Amino acid sequence: LKALARAYFEEARWFNEGYTPTMEEYLPAAIVSTGYHMLSTVSLLGMGDIVTKDTFEWLFSDPKIVRASAAICRLMDDIVTNKFEKERGHVACTIDCYMKQYGVSEQEAVDALNKQVVDQWKDINEEFLRPTAAPMAVLIRALNFAKVMDLLYKGDDGYTRVGKVVKDKIASHFIDPVPII
C-alpha cells in the first residue's frame, strides 16, 4: 500500500511540474500505480489452504509472471487511453515518455509498446514452462488478470467506457462459451 501511495505521489508531482519522465523513471512508478500488485495480493486471500506463507513470500519477491501481467495492464491501458487522458489533463503516459525519449512519432511509440506487450505475454508463457514455488492455481490467477486486461483494453478503453463491445466479449466468455470437445 505504501508503494502504491508513493507511485501516486510521484505521478502527481510529474503532472504538477509538467514533467515528462524517461521510460526508466516512468514504468516502475506507473506499473505500481495500476494497483495490480495490491490486487494480486488481495486476490489470494480467498483461495483457501492452497495459499501458504511461502506463496505470499513468492509473490512479494516480484516474480516475472506478476511483473509481466502488471506491465501488460499498464501498457495496454496507456495505449488506448492516451488521447482521452490528454483531453482531461493527466500525467504523461508511456506513449509520451517513449516519444520524447526516442524522438519518434506517436504511431511508432504505439508499435514499440505493442511489441513490449507481446514480449510480456512471452514472459508469462515462460513462467508456466518452468517450475516455481507458487501453486499452479496462483499462476493461473496471474494469467487471468492479464487476460482481463487484454479483454478490457484491446483496441479500446473498455474499462472507462464499458459498452456493447465489452458486454459482448464478457458474454462470449461466460454465457456463450465455445464448448470443448
Predicted segments, located by residue:
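Alpha-helical, largely C-terminal catalytic domains
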Residues: L1-I181
